[in-house]
């Protein structure tokens, strides 16, 4: 290249073309000066959809929502300096959730690093603890051989592509230093291509002979966590043929099927004193939400088998006896060919206690006025065509306990399990799905900036906001009794915020509810941008939850 602008243009147009070739269709851009070359290249590409979000932290979570909704990798782009650091929470969540987030950070040229230049921090390897792949690109120089630069880009993107699909999925980081002038030549649009490449396929085949002896034992359990869009029909088929109960996390999507072998009330039963024994456990997918079930897995003597379709198995809460890196469908298809034993009585015990528990839960909800009553009512309003995104902390735990008859899809950020970026993730999903957000007041406050994407892009999202003026989940922890004098200031953390003002700021309709009877008339099927605020009381919420545990303990007369 005989001038800087042409070299820069060739570089960024090639990068964007390669990103498209490997399946990137959406990019979330946080505006800034140093990212000018890539931002213009992305905007000029005829088949890429760009989203503009001025807050990098929220932007990265919005991209995560786009990934969850589209089931495709998504890229994010920011300028240099502290802007990139704001991506860290979402990158850590993507890493633990095995989501292919493509992180594009613009950077100052090498001669401005480490000398106190503005907006210049050390961006190389800055996400090393979380990304699957990282590369610091060379600067486009006017005397560069264009083939060398193009080949470098293509080689690095080819290497990075293995982490966008299959069991190796996870975030990748491409750091791109640019020297001024920063504007590429937009008349060279013919350098932008829309070719696609054969995407890598990664699937190991594994023999299951080493666990054949386990299949001859009677008390077997299948525990299924978040399956991240994986096919699960063979789990149900295997369970039907072999009479094995399935303890299904709501994020597994198996509860939607209303299969007679699927157990939904296990967390409440364990909290209420159920004693559980098993010979072996097949753990599928990511770890479950239920703290009580995870505690049992940690101490049980049952033989544990882990099945996850990624090369970084999530072994929590305890390392299994054997682990398989393969899809659930392939695993259970092979397992079905093994000889087995009669388990009808074992399954019927589970079905009986599940049936009795559901009766008690529904009876309790008829008179309850706490957050569980509202959550149960929200789930009752949703149909099989709906989806719900659930915030961490108390909302996801209530959904875990009360998702019984609902047929909606359930989603949550259960990688790092934080309360940051929840609204932004839900808004990203809302681009591709009709979705309702269930969230607490602290998580909502934490990501109010994210609501701007709804206002700017007319993204419709119904938000059910559970407002107990603080951190309700802490009321259940030992700190409530052990450090009561300090509890409200350090853990209760009331804010006293009036969220009606938030609705006005971001053009959301707003309704506030003080009683469950009034909320029953709320029509969540009328989709728009709407905040349904529910006022609750933390201590009352705790006492009514404890009342439900007591009811269930009275029906437990069997050891499973």
From Swiss-Prot:
Cofactor (UniProt): Mg(2+); Mn(2+); thiamine diphosphate
Catalysed transformations (reactions): isochorismate + 2-oxoglutarate + H(+) = 5-enolpyruvoyl-6-hydroxy-2-succinyl-cyclohex-3-ene-1-carboxylate + CO2
Subunit structure: Homodimer.
Entry's family note: Belongs to the TPP enzyme family. MenD subfamily.
Task of the protein: Catalyzes the thiamine diphosphate-dependent decarboxylation of 2-oxoglutarate and the subsequent addition of the resulting succinic semialdehyde-thiamine pyrophosphate anion to isochorismate to yield 2-succinyl-5-enolpyruvyl-6-hydroxy-3-cyclohexene-1-carboxylate (SEPHCHC).
EC annotation from Swiss-Prot or TrEMBL: 2.2.1.9
Record-linked CDD domains: TPP_PYR_MenD, TPP_SHCHC_synthase
Annotated GO MF terms: 2-succinyl-5-enolpyruvyl-6-hydroxy-3-cyclohexene-1-carboxylic-acid synthase activity; magnesium ion binding; manganese ion binding; thiamine pyrophosphate binding
Superkingdom, taxonomy of origin: Bacteria
InterPro entries: DHS-like_NAD/FAD-binding_dom (IPR029035), MenaQ_synth_MenD (IPR004433), MenD_middle (IPR032264), THDP-binding (IPR029061), Thiamin_PyroP_enz_TPP-bd_dom (IPR012001)
Cofactor note: Binds 1 thiamine pyrophosphate per subunit.
HAMAP family listed in its UniProt record: MenD
Pathway(s) per entry: Quinol/quinone metabolism; 1,4-dihydroxy-2-naphthoate biosynthesis; 1,4-dihydroxy-2-naphthoate from chorismate: step 2/7; Quinol/quinone metabolism; menaquinone biosynthesis
Leading EC class: transferase
Keywords for the protein's UniProt record, in alphabetical order: Magnesium, Manganese, Menaquinone biosynthesis, Metal-binding, Thiamine pyrophosphate, Transferase
Single biological process term from Gene Ontology: menaquinone biosynthetic process
Organism: Staphylococcus saprophyticus subsp. saprophyticus (strain ATCC 15305 / DSM 20229 / NCIMB 8711 / NCTC 7292 / S-41)
Full protein name: 2-succinyl-5-enolpyruvyl-6-hydroxy-3-cyclohexene-1-carboxylate synthase
SUPFAM superfamilies, A to Z: DHS-like NAD/FAD-binding domain, Thiamin diphosphate-binding fold (THDP-binding)
